[in-house]
Amino acid sequence: MSTETPTIPEGTEPKTAEGDEVIEPRTEVELGYAGASQVVADGGAATVALFGNVHRSEVRGGGKIKDPLRFREALSALHDVVQSDFRYVPKDRTAYLAYTRLKKASAGLDLWEAQRAYVDWLQRNDPLAFALLDPIVSVHPDEIFFEVFSKDEGSYAKLGVDLSALEPDANPIFGTTNIDFSDELFGGIQRLRSYRETRLAVASHAVALTTTGVPEVLEKKVRVPDAWLRGFLQVQSAGTLPRTVFRLAPIDLYNVLRHLRLNADVPTTSAAPGKAKPKRGGRGMRIELVPGEAPRLVLEPWEVVIPTTAGVFTGTKPEVVRIWGRRRLLLLRRLLPFADSIDVHLLGSGLPSFYVLRAGAFTFTLGLSGFTSANWAQAVSFDLLLPRKADSAATERVAAHLAKSWSGSAQAIAKATGLSPAETLEALQVGCQQGKLMFDVARDIYRYRPLTGAPLDSSRFEFRNVRERRAHDLCAQKGVVRIVSENRIHGVGLELTGKIIVAADKREYRPELLIDDEGRVKKAECTCAFFRKHQLKEGPCEHLIALRLFEAREEVKRREQRGKTRGTITMETRTYARRHARGEDVYQLALDQKRLKIRWGLRGQDARVQSLFFNSADDARVAYFERVDDLEKRGFLDASAS
C-alpha cells in the first residue's frame, strides 16, 4: 500500500489578508527511489533502467526494444516537453536583491545553516524549482506509457510504447509510478544506437545495478503548486470533449516548423507616412476545414497558406479554427522524421488541441492548452467546458471497473457498469479531473491511472483561488451579474462593461474588460477595493472573473441557439471568410439592436465599412440574416470564433 500522503505543508495553506489576497497552496508529494534512473552499458548492450517510486505500489515491466532509434527520439521529445517553458520572463533584479539580503542575513551562520537558509529562500521565491512532479510511467496489458506536463502549464505529452515494440519480459506487474527523469538519464539516452541491443526495465526494486556510496533509497519531496496539478488534470481531461479530427502528413508539419524557425513573431508591414506604427501581428495558426477539400494551415501574421497532403477533410461542417501555442509544436521536431502520420484533434478556437504522432509501434501525443497560466481570461472560459460536479457513486463505480480491466471505451464501460451513456461520460470526465483516470486520445479509450499514490482532494482543484470561487457564486445568483455594453471593435477585440450588484457588500461594481482577438486581456478595470489596491499584479478580482464567466456562458448559449431561434436574437457578430487566388475575402456582420454594421475587404488590408440603421430591431435582424444566408450560399466559411 502506498504511504504517499499529499498534504499542504505548514505555511503553504491558503491565507487571506483583508479578505482578498491569496497565497498559492501546494501539495507535498513524497518520492523515493531505490536508485538513480540511468542508461547502463554492458558490453554491446544497453539497458534503460527506470526506478519507480518505492512509496507507490510495485510496478514492473519492460523488454528488448526492437527499434532503439525511434525509442531514443521519442524519449528525447518527452524530455523537451518536461523542460519547456514558454512564459515571458521580464528583466528584473528582484531575485538578485533578495539574494544579497539573504547573504547579509546569513553571514554569521555556519555552513549547514546557511545552506538551509538558501534552500528555504529558493522554496519561497522560486517554487517551480521544486514543483515539478516527476514523470509518470504506467505498465498496462497493452502498452507502457509515459506522461509529462510542462512548467508553464501549456504542454502535456504522452508517449505510448505498444507491446509490439518490445520483446516483453515475463511476469509484468501492472500499475502506475513515478520515475526520475534526470539530465544524466537524458544524456545516456542520447547514446543509444540502432546497432546496439537496447532493453527497457521499469521497476521499483528489481532493476539490478551496482551502486556504491549512495543511500539505500533516494528520498525527495516536491511541493507542487495546486494550479500546476489542476492544469495537468484539466488539459488531459480536455481530450474527453467533442473534437474535430483531421490528418496531416509529416511533411506538412515540417513546413510549418520550418517557417516558424525562419521567421520571428514580428509585424510584417511598416508604418505608412503620418500613421502610427502597426501593432504586433497575430501569433495564431488558422486551420481552414472544408468537407471534401484538403485542410489548409494559415500562419499569422504572414498569411502564409500551407496546403496539406494527407487527404481531404471528412467532416460535415465547414469551419475555421484558430489555435495558439504554435511554437510549442517545435517540441516534436526530433520525432518528426520517424513519424508515419499525424492526427490533429481540435476542440475549437482558442481551446486545447492534440497532435498524435504515430511512429511504428510508438505513439506520441502532444496536448497544447492554447494558453499559459498567465492568461486567466482564456483559462476561465475553458473551465466552462468541463463538468463541475457529478455523482460520486457513478465515478467510483467507473473507477472500480477500470481498476480491474485497466482500459476500455466509453461504450464498453457503460455496458459493464450499467450506467447510461451520459452518466458514464460525465463520470469519466470527473474521474479524469480527479486524477484517478486518464483519456488516451490516440486510442480513444479510458485508462486507470492514479496520478498520485494517495487520492487527491478534488475540492482543492475545483477553483484556482477563492476569488474564482466567489465569481462562480456571483454568476450562479440570478440577476447579480449583467452586461451593460458589449462592443466588438474591429482589429482590437471585445470590449465589455458589466454591472455587478453584491447584496452582502451593499455595493454596485462596474468591471470593464477589453479582450483582444487572441483571448488576452488588454485592459481591465473595476471599482472594487481589491483592484484599486493591486490592479492585476495579484490576479483579477472576483468581479472581472465573473464578468468574463458570464460573457462566456452567454456566448455558448448564443452559439447553441444559432440557426434555431433567429427571432430572439438582437445582438450578434459573425465573421465569414473565403479564399481565392488574390487572397482572402473577409466579411464581418455586427447586429446591435436597430443597427447593422458591415465590414468587408481583403484580409490584411483596410476594410470598407457600411452602417445601416433601421426603424425596428426586427427589420435589422431580417437584414442581418439575409446577408448571413447569402454569404453561406456563396461558399464563405464561418470564422466567427477564429
Q: Each PLM stretch: what is its role?
A:
Residues 2-642:
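Long, low-complexity, compositionally biased intrinsically disordered regions
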